[in-house]
């Protein structure tokens, strides 16, 4: 799973996610992408589950880019512990995602396969997402 090798601080404030994605909102690598439509925190486990869903569906063809990284630690206290006596220890890592952010990119696969792969990945994520394509690419089968 993804997590930073080292950080400046061990714990982080919870904070709020405001506004739209300032960067990372356009396709930079692949022909197809999965774009976030709402703000949320996506855990490293969710990113890994989505990655596995995509790679299983495309079956070793094409190339996948993960455009988000879980760099924020989330701390929690153990069960049945009284309040107070400091902040809990870091339990897992999350990526703060704003609307418009590209989460994954794919290239080297046909559009319909990319669309189904992203739909399977979307089922693993806690937010609404949209499949986007570079200009000139098709993501739906022509009847």
Swiss-Prot record:
One of its GO terms (cellular component) is cytosolic large ribosomal subunit. The keyword Ribonucleoprotein applies. One of its GO terms (biological process) is translation. Pfam families: Ribosomal_L16. Residues 1-20 are annotated as: Disordered. GO terms for molecular function: rRNA binding; structural constituent of ribosome; tRNA binding. SUPFAM superfamilies: Ribosomal protein L16p/L10e (SSF54686). Keywords: Ribonucleoprotein, Ribosomal protein, RNA-binding, rRNA-binding, tRNA-binding. Residues 1-17 have a biased composition (Basic residues). The keyword Isomerase does not apply. Binds 23S rRNA and is also seen to make contacts with the A and possibly P site tRNAs. NCBIfam families: rplP_bact (TIGR01164). Belongs to the universal ribosomal protein uL16 family. Part of the 50S ribosomal subunit. This is Large ribosomal subunit protein uL16. It comes from Zymomonas mobilis subsp. mobilis (strain ATCC 31821 / ZM4 / CP4). The lineage of its organism: Bacteria, Pseudomonadati, Pseudomonadota, Alphaproteobacteria, Sphingomonadales.
């Amino acid at each position: 799973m993804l997590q930073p090798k080292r950080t400046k601080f061990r714990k982080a404030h919870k904070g709020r996610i405001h506004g739209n994605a300032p960067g990372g909102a356009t396709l930079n690598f692949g022909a197809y992408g999965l774009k976030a439509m709402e703000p949320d925190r996506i855990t490293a486990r969710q990113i890994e589950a989505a990655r596995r869903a995509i790679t299983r569906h495309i079956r070793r063809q094409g190339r996948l880019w993960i455009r988000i990284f879980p760099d924020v630690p989330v701390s929690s206290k153990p069960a049945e512990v009284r309040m107070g006596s400091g902040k809990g220890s870091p339990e897992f890592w999350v990526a703060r995602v704003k609307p418009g952010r590209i989460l994954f990119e794919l290239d080297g696969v046909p559009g319909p396969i990319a669309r189904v792969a992203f739909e399977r990945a979307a089922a693993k994520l806690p937010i609404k997402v949209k499949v986007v394509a570079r200009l000139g690419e098709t993501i739906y089968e022509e009847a």
